[in-house]
Amino acid sequence: MGNAGSMDSQQTDFRAHNVPLKLPMPEPGELEERFAIVLNAMNLPPDKARLLRQYDNEKKWELICDQERFQVKNPPHTYIQKLKGYLDPAVTRKKFRRRVQESTQVLRELEISLRTNHIGWVREFLNEENKGLDVLVEYLSFAQYAVTFDFESVESTVESSVDKSKPWSRSIEDLHRGSNLPSPVGNSVSRSGRHSALRYNTLPSRRTLKNSRLVSKKDDVHVCIMCLRAIMNYQYGFNMVMSHPHAVNEIALSLNNKNPRTKALVLELLAAVCLVRGGHEIILSAFDNFKEVCGEKQRFEKLMEHFRNEDNNIDFMVASMQFINIVVHSVEDMNFRVHLQYEFTKLGLDEYLDKLKHTESDKLQVQIQAYLDNVFDVGALLEDAETKNAALERVEELEENISHLSEKLQDTENEAMSKIVELEKQLMQRNKELDVVREIYKDANTQVHTLRKMVKEKEEAIQRQSTLEKKIHELEKQGTIKIQKKGDGDIAILPVVASGTLSMGSEVVAGNSVGPTMGAASSGPLPPPPPPLPPSSDTPETVQNGPVTPPMPPPPPPPPPPPPPPPPPPPPPLPGPAAETVPAPPLAPPLPSAPPLPGTSSPTVVFNSGLAAVKIKKPIKTKFRMPVFNWVALKPNQINGTVFNEIDDERILEDLNVDEFEEIFKTKAQGPAIDLSSSKQKIPQKGSNKVTLLEANRAKNLAITLRKAGKTADEICKAIHVFDLKTLPVDFVECLMRFLPTENEVKVLRLYERERKPLENLSDEDRFMMQFSKIERLMQKMTIMAFIGNFAESIQMLTPQLHAIIAASVSIKSSQKLKKILEIILALGNYMNSSKRGAVYGFKLQSLDLLLDTKSTDRKQTLLHYISNVVKEKYHQVSLFYNELHYVEKAAAVSLENVLLDVKELQRGMDLTKREYTMHDHNTLLKEFILNNEGKLKKLQDDAKIAQDAFDDVVKYFGENPKTTPPSVFFPVFVRFVKAYKQAEEENELRKKQEQALMEKLLEQEALMEQQDPKSPSHKSKRQQQELIAELRRRQVKDNRHVYEGKDGAIEDIITVLKTVPFTARTAKRGSRFFCEPVLTEEYHY
């Protein structure tokens, strides 16, 4: 080591003497040009080149000077000539000793040049003319001749050396099968392989062994390994080293070096090669060669021996443990992993690791634990396979239990919703009571304050009166005044003048009474009110819509006026609205009926629609069947004031040739022509003698309804009178309500009855309507019956709707996870808009629908997809926020306005029922209905109030207006948002699976493209695919390790990363995908 130290000092002095003076900095333009040339020559990755471009001009100039100094140091052939000189066997030992003094220094300069010079210098060193790699490997072999041959006798060494080319030849064949190097390089390798094999088949001479022992005492082996590492750091150099027949073998044989630092360097380099595609097989082949050369009984025997014996060097032990972990567990074939694992188990690795489990070195402990985590437990795998079926059956049972529990959970949620509603009602009631108590307290506090103020004023008045009385007594004693009492209790204070006589002016002080004048004025009676004015004329005065009253004399004020005489009977009603608005004197004659229309000889039936008299048109009978004209007809009550009220279509028909019209438009399928004259003569003979007062269609529909009931008119009317819903179902009552007699129908029926015409002549429908219309308060009773019959169904229908509104409102307002989601959306929205529109403090809920409209640059995902990813990765605890939103979908389908109107209708129906019961308190059916259902209606009203308040609160809570945002608008926003969010989650998962499948496919294609020439046209697409693979890996692997593609600097990166992050295999310790999720790791490949 002292020699090494002297070499280092010589190296420092040598560099100090050769450092040129600092040249002046050129112009900025020239500086940038020279810096660009140097940067291109350095062949750096883009990120490092970008970092160097950020240097200031001073640092750039220093870098230019350093690079130019290194570049002009020595050309490659200089180092090659010096190394060949050390290998010359004809050199005398004295001359060799003098030359070898500077060998380490030459190798160090070579390593620096290989590591720092541009790629052109390295390619020149490795080209066909210089063959720098062959020379370097040959020198490495020479440097460790002595170490290798000192392990065995000369005889065994000869046998090993003769067979040494066999594993090399096998390795060469394997390498050439998968080599993708260009043909010139392949020819170079084959030639160098023949040259090296020729040398290895000859026994080293005695002088060579002595020279090798002299070199082995120095650091030449260590620096040679560093030179090879620098070469392998370039992709071009790495491929050449991997294709060289002896390079990796010589690196592995360097483990025989006595320097632990060198052995650690070798193991780190071999471990990095294992992680490159195809490198693992080369490393195993090198250790097979190591076994034959060193006479091992088992592979890796010397490695384990060094691992046990070098326990005082932690760095070497860490490197050994790291290499063992990688060489065993970096292969994909699980059976091969178990085989390699068992190799080290037979060498005693497991027992030795058990001894090292209490080591004080954290680095070593980390590597040991990484190996133990990657170990395959075959027994555990067998147990997993045996228990898998039982576990699957258990899973099925658990899924069935989950299904049952989900049903129970749904029932529990329904019960919870009812309890929540009850609690909300109680809370609202308590809040109301609290408000009342506060008002009472406020009023009481005001009254107490007022009373205290009055007491204080009274006390002050008493005190003032006492003071005045004292002053009066004092003045009386002094003789200034004289107090004179009067008979009515008043006190007169008379001042005394100097002459001793009383003053004429006296002051009267009122005690408990007022003065005489004021008392008289206040105690006198009020004047009587003026009598009412007499009527202006003696003629009787008529009152609109009221009876005629004669004038009465004005009564005196004290007695009440006598009642007016009874009015005369009212006149008969007039048809039309004039009877309601125009007053008429008694005994006024009725108006004459309207004359018949032109062209008609018989009078027409006229009915009053409330607006104007409308003539009922008779149906027209045609000879042939005519097609139907599908128009939209106006109802009779809709033509008043229209143009149709002023035209007469029947007069037009008289002017037209209807026979021709029928002939033209008659339908194709016709029967014999109808003789209208004969039919008119037969109608009176076939028709019944019954008289019909109702409109034909109405009477027909009424007859159908009555036939469905199967009850007589008496039974129906009696059931209506006593509200018997058992006799009359509610459906029949609702149908019958459509046939409540109109005012005109009642008038026609009453007129028929007053004329005392026989009822037998009426049809069944008219007789029913006659009896039906005589029921007192028919409209009210029918409404009450319909209300009572539908009450239970209405309560059952409205209650769940109100509960859904309450539960949805409370769950949305109280959801902390939803609040977090909105917070994320607000943050991202402000981030996107702040530079253009400025930051906002909130947003309308309708903005949630716009999350799907905001798409990424590549148009492959929306803002909602991104939010879903962010929530899953950063805020996983709120990813199931929609589970906190209960009954939102049910609430979205509720029209709260209509529900509240229905509740009010129920209240009106209950009020109508109560009024009817007060008039007929003997009706037990009404009494029982009111007693049993009044509380239910009150509860429903409370629920409606709570639902309205809860909905208003949640709408205001989210910044919306309850008046313009009904539940049908508010809740669907959350329904759509939750649906879109779930869909975004599913699409994100699908996209990840597709990306994973694509990555696997590209990995398969990558193996095939390794055979392609880098200069071919497909090389560019290959690089793009490799970049895509790297990106996909970065998405999958969540740790800080990098992905290595075919680029310069990869070996250094792998070694650096392995020092910080231990290697983790693809499958964990148990190795069962059923019980443990596979742990993804990286593949390092070129």
From Swiss-Prot:
Biased amino acid composition, Pro residues? 525-537, 548-576, 583-597
Q: Can you give the residue ranges of the DAD domain?
A: 1040-1079
Under Gene3D superfamilies, the record lists: Formin, FH2 domain (1.20.58.2220), Leucine-rich Repeat Variant (1.25.10.10)
Residue ranges of every copy of the GBD/FH3 domain listed in the record: 23-469
Q: Where is the FH2 domain?
A: 616-1007
Tell me which residues bear Phosphoserine. Answer: 188
Q: Where is the lipid attached (N-myristoyl glycine)?
A: 2
Kindly indicate where the leader peptide sits in this chain.
none
What Pfam families does the record tag this protein with? Drf_FH3 (PF06367), Drf_GBD (PF06371), FH2 (PF02181)
Composition bias (Polar residues) maps to 538-547
UniProt-listed InterPro entries: ARM-like (IPR011989), ARM-type_fold (IPR016024), DAD_dom (IPR014767), FH2_Formin (IPR015425), FH2_Formin_sf (IPR042201), FH3_dom (IPR010472), FMNL_animal (IPR043592), GBD/FH3_dom (IPR014768)
The record's GO CC annotations read: cytosol
Function in brief: Plays a role in the regulation of cell morphology and cytoskeletal organization. Required in the cortical actin filament dynamics.
Q: What is known of its domains?
A: The DAD domain regulates activation via by an autoinhibitory interaction with the GBD/FH3 domain. This autoinhibition is released upon competitive binding of an activated GTPase. The release of DAD allows the FH2 domain to then nucleate and elongate nonbranched actin filaments.
**PANTHER family in the cross-refs:** FORMIN-LIKE PROTEIN, FORMIN-LIKE PROTEIN 2
The UniProt similarity line reads: Belongs to the formin homology family.
State the name under which the record lists this protein.
Answer: Formin-like protein 2
Q: Which organism is it from?
A: Homo sapiens
